[in-house]
Amino acid sequence: MRAVVQRALGARVEVGGQVVGAIERGLVAFVGAAKDDDDADADHVASKIAGLRVFSDDAGKMSRALADVRGGGVLAISQFTLFGDVRRGLRPSFDGAMEPVRAEALYDRFVAALRARGLTVATGRFRADMRVFVENDGPVTILIDSKRTF
């Protein structure tokens, strides 16, 4: 499972012009599943995001996790395009992405794992054409992958 995580002052996601998920200060996580991912991958990425220390303490050091931020939440957006492969040619191949039915179940597992860690989670709509609005903070952007390091 792969995630692009951005620290945000606020974010929302719309489907068909209607807001379906929103957070104030927190993290936006764009998340995709690989063909061979399983529950352990979803739990691993959720654990990393829950413990990610990217919020500043009183001294200005990034040492606080989301649980330490008053009113903080996660906006989780499913995004299979994180597995777009352009090593050959210019059109991305998505062969590495999990098929949609299994991916939706794993995405739901990921969201449940975040909530089980006490986080407030808003979501987009799986397989929908979404508009995502993020007010980046920093910016701080972190890449997480359950199978490899960046």
Curated annotation (Swiss-Prot):
Subcellular location: Cytoplasm
Single GO molecular function: Ser(Gly)-tRNA(Ala) hydrolase activity
Domain of life according to the entry: Bacteria
Short name of one Pfam family: Tyr_Deacylase
GO cellular component labels: cytoplasm
Key word Transmembrane helix present: no
Gene Ontology terms describing biological process: D-amino acid catabolic process
Key words, A-Z: Cytoplasm, Hydrolase, RNA-binding, tRNA-binding
Chain span(s) of sequence motif Gly-cisPro motif, important for rejection of L-amino acids: 138-139
Function: An aminoacyl-tRNA editing enzyme that deacylates mischarged D-aminoacyl-tRNAs. Also deacylates mischarged glycyl-tRNA(Ala), protecting cells against glycine mischarging by AlaRS. Acts via tRNA-based rather than protein-based catalysis; rejects L-amino acids rather than detecting D-amino acids in the active site. By recycling D-aminoacyl-tRNA to D-amino acids and free tRNA molecules, this enzyme counteracts the toxicity associated with the formation of D-aminoacyl-tRNA entities in vivo and helps enforce protein L-homochirality.
Subunit field text: Homodimer.
UniProt domain comment: A Gly-cisPro motif from one monomer fits into the active site of the other monomer to allow specific chiral rejection of L-amino acids.
Family listed: Belongs to the DTD family.
NCBIfam families: D-aminoacyl-tRNA deacylase
The name this protein goes by in its record: D-aminoacyl-tRNA deacylase
